């Protein structure tokens, strides 16, 4: 099944890609019937893949792994100055192959297929820089919170340190346990009824966000995106987090700001 979509972002810059230019082919890899090699027809356009399995990738070629049997919709979006166009194809994976879940990011984030299959993460509140901010774009100093870095327990009582974030491998499920409140940037307080000023920003009543999902975008700077309604740490209006460092028990993230101009930083640890 092939589905197409087109978006013309700026007609003054020319036409968006054609249907033919947005097409792609796939083939079964030599390593596993559950691993597909994807190739965009247009090698010179910016290409964004959604494998339909909770993973995204960029580039004219990509490799998609499907540990679980089922039908998946692969989506390719190609971009030029005139806009974008998307096409999709459905693929059927006949058998489950759990060995494909040995992705190191999956394993560190969730415990992996041979472990518990989920991990609970919390803010590493006793570490300097567990929350911080710097410029966007980054300065020559790089990925550091050069403008401000929280000291140990700086935000105690703000509704941040008792939050829990549970990443589950099966179905890429994500649960956000708030214990009744969250900590949000002052510019977003109006979106949270009942919020009140606290330690420079706002604490807001907010219930648990259960049965959400998380999505990994792989590459040189892998990112995690959580689904609407959920988020990680101090809320700045974005849902995508760049992984700066990830071990079996610690995680450092960088993320943006809804109005631009800022990069926020977060340190977490396993519970």
Regions found by a protein language model. Give the residues of each.
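Short, solvent-exposed loop/hinge segments that bridge or flank secondary-structure elements
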Residues: 123-171, 176, 262-264
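Short, low-complexity, Pro/Ser/Thr/Gly-rich segments in the mature regions of secreted, periplasmic
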Residues: 261-271
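Short helix-loop boundary/capping segments
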Residues: 185-188, 254, 269-271
């Amino acid at each position: 099944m092939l589905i197409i979509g087109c978006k013309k972002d700026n007609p003054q810059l020319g036409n968006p890609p054609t249907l033919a230019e947005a097409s792609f082919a796939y083939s079964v890899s030599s390593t596993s019937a559950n691993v597909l090699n994807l190739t965009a027809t247009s090698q010179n356009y910016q290409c964004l893949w959604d494998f339909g399995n909770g993973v995204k990738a960029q580039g004219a070629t990509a490799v998609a792994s499907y540990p679980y049997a089922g039908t998946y919709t692969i989506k390719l979006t190609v971009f030029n100055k005139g806009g974008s166009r998307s096409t999709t194809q459905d693929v059927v994976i006949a058998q489950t192959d759990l060995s494909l879940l040995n992705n190191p990011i999956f394993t560190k984030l969730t415990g992996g297929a041979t472990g518990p299959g989920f991990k609970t993460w919390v803010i590493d509140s006793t570490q300097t820089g567990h929350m911080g901010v710097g410029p966007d774009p980054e300065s020559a100093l790089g990925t550091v919170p050069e403008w401000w870095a929280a000291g140990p327990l700086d935000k105690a009582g703000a509704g941040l340190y008792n939050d829990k974030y549970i990443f589950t491998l099966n179905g890429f499920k994500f649960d956000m346990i708030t214990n009744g409140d969250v900590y949000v940037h002052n510019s977003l307080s109006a979106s949270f009824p009942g919020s009140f000023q606290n330690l420079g920003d706002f604490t807001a009543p907010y219930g648990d966000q259960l049965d959400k999902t998380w999505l990994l975008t792989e590459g040189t700077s892998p990112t995690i995106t959580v689904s609407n309604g959920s988020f990680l740490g101090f809320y700045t209006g974005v849902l995508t987090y760049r992984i700066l460092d990830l071990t079996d028990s610690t995680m450092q993230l960088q993320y943006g700001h809804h109005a631009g101009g800022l990069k926020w930083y977060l340190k977490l640890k396993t519970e």
